[in-house]
């Protein structure tokens, strides 16, 4: 018997691209959403998680049975926990304690060990602790923030999928920026196909907090980030991102997280500035891992 998907790992990628139906954009523009929550562990991070582990294996840097360590705000941790379960690794994940209960529970459900740092220490503190644990010989850090296999996963899969699905007509790509792996890899691929494609990054405005993305201090800026691969950065208020997240669920039937709502909010803004554009925004995960945060409790 030949199976199309022999293992759960084979289900990663080739996610749907759908058209925005009801939220207001300029009528001459085509607004499209890449549904990365359809990946088996529920987010765009399934792609780099498998890439980082598989390519490290091919280089002989890690072997089944090793202990892997990673600092994460949520989605990468869940994806790595899944990948570690598939491939036989022990996974230690370090994250801020203000992350949603659902994300914490998903990691431990896959068998990962979870270490929490304080909200005040944040992702910077989580990253520092991961490095100290590696130095103490407690495991090997994959380091999504500096690991070239992170953007490479999007260069070889996400970018080509978007180009194929839009039949080469894409004019704008919009993505929230956390590790920046998605936007770096997709930008590289799309710009190789058409240098005119505009790459738009999203970050929280000063004083705003949007789960999964950061406004990094210079000393913690991901090493994989290359500023010249992004044409424009949009600062987004938490309130606007949350509002669009709720509207996506209630008006489009698309249940996603706040960073995805922020990406769509940025796309709606941009749509008012141009005509005859084909815009693609990344819907990086699903809304069920944010239910306990209360963002969906606000009235219509």
Give the ranges of each region predicted by the language model.
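PLP-dependent amino-acid enzyme catalytic core
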Residues: 1-300
């Amino acid at each position: 018997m030949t199976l199309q998907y022999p293992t759960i790992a084979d289900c990663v990628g080739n996610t749907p691209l759908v058209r925005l139906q009801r939220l207001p954009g300029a009528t001459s523009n085509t607004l499209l959403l890449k549904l990365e929550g359809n990946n088996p562990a529920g987010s765009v991070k399934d792609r780099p998680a498998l890439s980082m582990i598989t390519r490290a294996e091919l280089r002989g840097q890690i072997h089944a049975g090793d202990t892997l360590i990673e600092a994460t705000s949520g989605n990468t941790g869940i994806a790595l926990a899944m990948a570690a379960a598939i491939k036989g690794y022990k996974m230690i994940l370090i994250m801020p304690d203000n992350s949603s209960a659902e994300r914490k529970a998903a990691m431990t459900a896959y068998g990962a060990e979870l270490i929490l740092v304080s909200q005040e220490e944040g992702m910077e503190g989580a990253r520092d602790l991961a490095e100290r644990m590696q130095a103490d010989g407690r495991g090997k850090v994959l380091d999504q923030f500096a690991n070239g296999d992170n953007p490479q996963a999007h260069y070889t899969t996400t970018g080509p999928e978007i180009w194929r699905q839009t039949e080469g007509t894409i004019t704008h790509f919009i993505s929230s920026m956390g590790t920046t792996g998605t936007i770096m890899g997709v930008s590289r691929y799309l710009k190789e196909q058409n240098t005119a494609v505009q790459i738009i990054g999203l970050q929280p405005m000063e004083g705003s907090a949007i789960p999964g993305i950061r406004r990094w201090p210079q000393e913690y800026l991901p090493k994989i980030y290359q500023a010249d691969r992004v044409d424009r950065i949009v600062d987004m208020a938490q309130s606007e991102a949350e509002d669009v997240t709720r509207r996506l669920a209630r008006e489009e039937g698309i249940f996603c997280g706040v960073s995805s709502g922020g990406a769509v909010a940025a796309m709606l803004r941009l749509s008012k500035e141009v005509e005859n554009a084909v815009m693609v925004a990344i819907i990086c995960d699903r809304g069920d891992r944010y239910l306990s945060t209360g963002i969906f409790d606000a009235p219509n």
